[in-house]
């Protein structure tokens, strides 16, 4: 079967497909062929096949790129905002040497754990985007749902799929309070910072996945 380009999916169709995938706990291709026909089967197989992790990450990166472009065009929040972003003290997940994802000191199990945990930590920031992002809401929804699907996929690759930590609800509540902005300018600055940070995290993750 020919592979399908993720750019061809609409956010709504893609999101529905991922929800079905997650609800059925990653069924086998044979099961999928029994459940649906034609393109619907192909769409679901794209995200249940173990070798499609890269495509899923690329899909998310494409949506992030589209959102950043929207922010740039609508609010002029472009690359010239780096100085402002550097001063922002949000505690966004980042890759470090100890995480085992860099070529020097690479450790597959440690790296998988860090990627999974980091993506879980990003969920609260994506909740914020769902609430505050005012442009194409479909892109935000697609990023959040596909990120959750990526978490499930990566957990299956690790030796301890349930070991990834879940942020404390109290911590999340405090973080949401911290994210609340007093003005439109700061809100948009936080949105672009979250998008940039998630993009960087996924770029590091993609490079690590390629050498696993």
From Swiss-Prot:
Kindly list the positions at which Phosphoserine occurs in this protein. 81
Q: Which PROSITE patterns match?
A: INTERLEUKIN_6
InterPro entries referenced in this protein's UniProt entry, alphabetically:
4_helix_cytokine-like_core (IPR009079), IL-6-like (IPR003574), IL-6/GCSF/MGF (IPR030474), IL6/GCSF/MGF_CS (IPR030473)
Q: Which GO terms describe its biological process?
A: acute-phase response; glucose homeostasis; hepatocyte proliferation; interleukin-6-mediated signaling pathway; liver regeneration; positive regulation of cell population proliferation; positive regulation of estradiol secretion; positive regulation of receptor signaling pathway via JAK-STAT
Record keyword Membrane present: no
- Chief localisation class: secreted
Compartments annotated for it: namely: Secreted
Segments for region (Disordered)? 156-175
Q: Name one GO cellular component term.
A: extracellular space
Q: Keywords assigned by UniProt? A: Acute phase, Cytokine, Disulfide bond, Growth factor, Phosphoprotein, Secreted, Signal
Against SMART domains, the record matches this protein to: IL6
Polar residues bias (residue ranges)? 163-175
* Pfam families, per the entry: IL6
Cystine bridges? 72-78, 101-111
GO terms (molecular function) for this protein are: cytokine activity; growth factor activity; interleukin-6 receptor binding
Entries under Gene3D superfamilies matching the protein: 1.20.1250.10
State the source organism's domain of life. Eukaryota
Which family is annotated?
Belongs to the IL-6 superfamily.
Q: How does it assemble?
A: Component of a hexamer of two molecules each of IL6, IL6R and IL6ST; first binds to IL6R to associate with the signaling subunit IL6ST. Interacts with IL6R (via the N-terminal ectodomain); this interaction may be affected by IL6R-binding with SORL1, hence decreasing IL6 cis signaling. Interacts with SORL1 (via the N-terminal ectodomain); this interaction leads to IL6 internalization and lysosomal degradation. May form a trimeric complex with the soluble SORL1 ectodomain and soluble IL6R receptor; this interaction might stabilize circulating IL6, hence promoting IL6 trans signaling.
Q: What does this protein do?
A: Cytokine with a wide variety of biological functions in immunity, tissue regeneration, and metabolism. Binds to IL6R, then the complex associates to the signaling subunit IL6ST/gp130 to trigger the intracellular IL6-signaling pathway. The interaction with the membrane-bound IL6R and IL6ST stimulates 'classic signaling', whereas the binding of IL6 and soluble IL6R to IL6ST stimulates 'trans-signaling'. Alternatively, 'cluster signaling' occurs when membrane-bound IL6:IL6R complexes on transmitter cells activate IL6ST receptors on neighboring receiver cells.
- Its protein name is Interleukin-6
Name the gene.
Answer: IL6
């Amino acid at each position: 079967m020919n592979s399908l380009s993720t750019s061809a999916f609409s956010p709504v169709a893609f999101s529905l497909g991922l929800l079905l995938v997650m609800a059925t706990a990653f069924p086998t291709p044979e099961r999928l062929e029994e459940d649906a026909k034609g393109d619907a089967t192909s769409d679901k197989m794209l995200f249940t096949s173990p070798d499609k992790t890269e495509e899923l990450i690329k899909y998310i990166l494409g949506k992030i790129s589209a959102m950043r472009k929207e922010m740039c065009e609508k609010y002029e929040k472009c690359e010239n905002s780096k100085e402002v972003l550097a001063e922002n003290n949000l505690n966004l997940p980042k890759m470090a040497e100890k995480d085992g994802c860099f070529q020097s000191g690479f450790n597959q199990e440690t790296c998988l754990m860090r990627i999974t945990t980091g993506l879980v930590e990003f969920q609260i920031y994506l909740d914020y985007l769902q609430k505050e992002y005012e442009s194409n809401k479909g892109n935000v929804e697609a990023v959040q749902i596909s990120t959750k699907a990526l978490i499930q996929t990566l957990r299956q690759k690790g030796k301890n799929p349930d070991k990834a930590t879940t942020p404390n609800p109290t911590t999340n509540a405090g973080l949401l309070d911290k994210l609340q902005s007093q003005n439109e300018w700061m809100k948009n600055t936080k949105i672009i910072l979250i998008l940039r940070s998630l993009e960087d995290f996924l770029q590091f993750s993609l490079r690590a996945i390629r050498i696993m």
